[in-house]
């Protein structure tokens, strides 16, 4: 994906496979525009019909969901972290909601990253639609790739991610990535629904980092369309 692609070019690529439109998202009186997939049911039916889903955790388009954890993370960053003039990296950004929400927190530079090409396309479109391209860069970042990433050679002040700890096989590579790229004194924050909380990751992280955990309530839309209260764990890993 070229960083120079225009919004129209990105939308042309996206609409070759998805029926999408921008939907308003009101956050504290600030209206954001976020791409919404209107034919997700048909897209999933196609994946199932072609036997493309071997492992639901890996093959389903989880990147397309606006995860409530992104809103919880933004609240935590705003209230508990020093963000002015700091650098920020979002891992597993999906459609980029967290980075877009956190764009108002005074970061000097932000990177929204994922390993899924479709996620990067949607994030780039959302960034351009909200005129944040001078603040947020969209990059393919694979934490499982060995060695240091030269793009983050100066280190990152804050690394954040919502709902990426569900794969146990990712825990060790993720901690290795933090060791290489988190600045001294930097913090990584992971938000997870309590139903998917991973104590094993915190135990591993505590061998090398200072680890703390807190809990914040959030609201999701249940299967019946009604709001449902949930509790989220916020795990902070400090170098």
PLM regions with names:
Residues 1-239:
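S-adenosylmethionine-dependent methyltransferases
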């Amino acid at each position: 994906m070229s960083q120079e692609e225009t919004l129209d070019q990105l939308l042309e690529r996206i609409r070759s496979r998805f029926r999408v439109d921008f939907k308003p998202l009101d956050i504290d009186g600030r209206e954001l525009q976020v791409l919404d997939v209107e034919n997700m049911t048909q897209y999933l039916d196609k994946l199932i019909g072609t036997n493309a889903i071997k492992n639901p955790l890996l093959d389903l388009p989880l990147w397309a969901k606006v995860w409530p954890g992104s809103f919880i993370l933004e609240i935590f960053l705003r209230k508990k972290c020093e963000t002015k003039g700091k650098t920020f990296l979002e891992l597993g950004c999906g459609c980029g909601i967290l980075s877009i929400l956190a764009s108002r927190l005074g970061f000097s530079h932000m990177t929204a990253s994922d390993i899924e090409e479709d996620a990067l396309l949607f994030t780039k479109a959302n960034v351009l639609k909200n005129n944040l391209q001078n603040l947020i860069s969209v990059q393919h970042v694979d934490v499982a790739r060995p060695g240091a990433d030269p793009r983050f050679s100066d280190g990152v002040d804050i690394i954040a991610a919502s709902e990426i700890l569900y794969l146990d096989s990712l825990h060790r590579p993720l901690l290795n990535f933090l060791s290489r790229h988190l600045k001294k004194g930097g913090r990584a924050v992971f938000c997870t629904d309590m139903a998917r909380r991973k104590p094993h990751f915190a135990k591993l992280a505590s061998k090398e980092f200072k680890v703390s955990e807190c809990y914040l309530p959030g609201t999701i839309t249940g299967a019946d369309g009604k709001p449902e209260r949930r509790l989220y764990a916020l795990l902070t890993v400090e170098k």
